[in-house]
From Swiss-Prot:
Record carries keyword Transferase: no
Organism field: Drosophila virilis (Fruit fly)
Location in or out of the cell: Cell membrane
Organism phylogeny: Eukaryota, Metazoa, Ecdysozoa, Arthropoda, Hexapoda
This protein's GO CC annotations: cilium; cytoplasm; dendrite; neuronal cell body; plasma membrane
Protein's name in the database: Sensory neuron membrane protein 1
Similarity comment: Belongs to the CD36 family.
Bilayer topology term: Multi-pass membrane protein
Entry's transmembrane regions: 8-28, 460-480
UniProt-annotated stretches for the region Disordered: 503-537
């Protein structure tokens, strides 16, 4: 019995120890190792194929801030805007001219985005709607010259009147013309001023303009970005070090930017946003470099959530206030003078795009209250305007995401150009975009069956083993309790034999036993006994 109890106790302890070591230590490490070997950008892997050409389109939404009182604003009035949208596009992403460097464990490629108008999802909008926005060329050129080349203002004003005859502070046109097809820029004049102004178009300084013949260009917000090169990246493949998977090490063949007055702002941090390393720490955040704004942005952990029944972590992004972070003072015009920093919740894009453009969250969400007060018709809210990503850390999978950004014009009165003389100084919202993705079951099932079923199996196994070990401990304890309640006494054999001899010996006859003779004590008469009573003290 003692041997059986000890075996049961030892087996229970062994099962418990195995459950703890395997369930909480070995299995997670084995799973992470298997994922790290699968999730790399090595040629021939499934991840490489998915990464190089996304097999499904992202959803790209455009919302317009249509100005409903342009004449009033031109005379110094407060702008009133009406949001129109979304205009929905299918955005296809692919990478081409891929070159691997096995020694450095990197891959270089060109990124390309292709936008296709989705009529069904955009309905009832058709893209032919007439909208009114700040004149993107007249205002941008006038404001930039006033700030940087004031001595040339007279010549520029003359050139603008020739190239854009009868131009006003606000431009009214069809949505598709402004954003993709383009509005005409006539550079056919032989006037010296006009030729000087058109030089910036011929040299490619105006990136949004496309030359159609020797004297004409088409300007649009996104036309030049459609199905064209978005820049050459060099990123880590993650074969030698899985933690560096997707990390941007070069852009345009440069190891860092030369855009901002500070090293911290010029560094590439994170990935190209199309892939993330598995097994990242929750507090590390999700960082990605965005060439459109010449900056790396990081999303921070907010809360736990679920997606199609699978646990995920939600990360959110905010432009914050660069004045409060000394490392970000390099995003100010003059890092030594905080008065030159952009308002809270905004980012100055002038060094990046070459014009008075300001980025912000849609409707100036989480921005300086004055930004909202300066314009009627803005209604920021977290649900519709915040940036978020639902992310699975162990596999590095983004389940769903919404990347949102608003583009604004940094407006100010331009004294040298008559149509712009009476404008208010403010940050004028023009439009905001959302790039969204939601993985369907085809791709979430890949994560579910390769990761979560394994995790569920491990969870079920370890708790089953722990339950068995507890049952074993309880059974052993019960047996030990029974032993202590009824002890087994073992008597030596010689004592048993002697005891039997005594028990089996013949008993003497009571009648044959001699009578005992009583010997009286001196002075005691046995024939007349008396009882003596004494007090007891």
């Amino acid at each position: 019995m003692l041997v059986h109890r000890m075996k049961l106790l030892t087996a229970s302890a062994g099962i418990l120890l195995f459950a703890i070591i395997f369930g909480w230590v070995l299995f997670p490490q084995i799973l992470k190792f298997m994922i790290s070997k699968q999730v790399t950008l090595k040629p021939g892997t499934d991840i490489r194929d998915l990464w190089s050409a996304t097999p499904f389109p992202l959803h790209f939404y455009i919302y317009i801030f249509n100005v409903t009182n342009p004449e009033e604003v031109a005379e110094g009035g407060k702008p009133r805007v009406q949001e129109i949208g979304p205009f929905v596009f299918d955005e296809w992403k692919d990478k081409y001219d891929l070159v691997d460097d096995v020694v450095e464990d990197t891959v270089s490629y060109n990124m390309r985005n292709t936008f296709i108008f989705n009529e069904k999802a955009s309905s009832p909008l058709t893209g032919e709607e007439i909208i009114t926005l700040p004149h993107p060329l007249l205002q941008s050129i006038g404001i930039t010259v006033q700030r940087e080349r004031a001595a040339m203002m007279e010549m520029v004003a003359k050139a603008l009147a020739i190239v854009f005859p009868d131009a006003k502070p606000f431009l009214t046109a069809k949505f598709m013309d402004l954003f993709f097809r383009g509005i005409d820029v006539d550079c056919s004049s032989d006037e010296f001023a006009a030729k000087a102004l058109c030089t910036v178009f011929y040299t490619g300084e105006v990136k949004q303009a496309k030359q159609v013949n020797q004297t004409h260009f088409l300007f649009s917000f996104l036309g030049q970005a459609n199905h064209s090169d978005a820049g050459r990246f060099t990123v880590c493949r993650g074969v030698k070090n899985n933690k560096k998977l997707g990390k941007v090490v070069k852009f345009a063949d440069e190891p860092e930017m030369d855009m901002w007055p500070g090293d911290e702002c010029n560094r590439f941090v994170g990935t190209d946003s199309t892939v993330f390393a598995p097994g990242m720490k929750q507090e590390a955040g999700l960082w990605a470099f965005t060439p459109d704004i010449c900056r790396s942005l990081g999303a921070i952990y907010q809360r736990k959530t679920t997606y199609h029944g699978m646990p995920a972590l939600r990360y959110t992004l905010d432009l914050g206030d660069v004045r409060l972070d000394e490392k970000l003072h390099c995003f100010c015009d003059d890092p030594e003078n905080l008065e030159t920093c952009p308002p809270k919740g905004t980012m100055n894009l002038a060094p990046c795009v070459g014009g008075p453009l300001i980025a912000s969250m849609p409707h100036f969400l989480n921005g300086d209250p004055k930004l909202i007060q300066d314009v009627d018709g803005l209604h920021p809210n977290e649900k519709e305007h915040a940036v978020f990503i639902d992310f699975e850390l162990m596999s590095g999978t983004p389940f769903q995401a919404a990347k949102r950004l608003q583009f604004n014009l940094d407006v100010e009165p331009v004294q040298g150009i008559e149509p712009l003389r009476h404008l208010r100084k403010l940050i004028m919202p023009m439009f905001w975009v959302e790039e969204g993705v939601q993985l369907n079951k085809t791709y979430t099932n890949m994560v579910k069956y390769t990761l979560f079923l394994g995790l569920k199996f491990n969870s079920g196994l370890r708790w089953t083993l722990i339950t068995l070990s507890l049952v074993g401990f309880m059974s052993a304890g019960y047996l030990f309790y029974q032993k202590s309640d009824s002890l087994d006494i073992t008597v030596p054999p010689n004592i048993i034999r002697e005891s039997n001899k005594v028990a089996n010996a013949p008993k003497p006859d009571r009648q044959q036993q001699p009578k005992a003779h009583l010997v009286p004590l001196p002075g005691v008469n046995l024939s007349n006994p008396k009882v003596e009573h004494r007090d007891r003290y």
